[in-house]
Amino acid sequence: MQSIKDIKQLFEQAEKEQWNALFPQYKTDERAGVQKLITQYENKLLKHKKEQERLYRMLEFERKYGDEFSCICGIDEAGRGPFAGPVVAGAVILPKGLTIEGLNDSKQVSAKKREELYDEIKEKAVSVGIGMSSPARIDEINILQATYEAMRHAVEDLDVVPDLLLNDAVTIPLIPIRQVGIV
């Protein structure tokens, strides 16, 4: 009889896609530790499936525009509406069809997860651009115009020129690239 430690190691070394094939082998094992382990991995698999469904929905616009446009860039900002601090925008072009688990609006992700995602995005992206407008600039031109400015700088910072921008619910003035506002 395999030890619980060995069974756990088997699941840890297997790919998520292989877990369903492993479950029947251990479902009849009456040891509480094995049943707890099976429940943990079933829950992990369910969580993974839900994440894949969420990511699939996120790619809705890529699927919609992917045949017409070969280089699609997502752009978003952080810091809009601050009392102090800059507004920062990021523009990212990912390879078609690429999904990154945990990718979400920065406000919905922990600081630690943002750092992990940043590293993975930098590693896998076709191109990444960053733009910023300082607090002084925000005071000078207002937060909305400073946001547009940061977004323009982010697009200008890209190594590759996109042919479509997917923006966070805005149309950025003075950018001669087709834009689609998403919410």
Can you describe what each PLM-predicted range is?
Residues D76:
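Phosphate-recognition beta-domain surfaces
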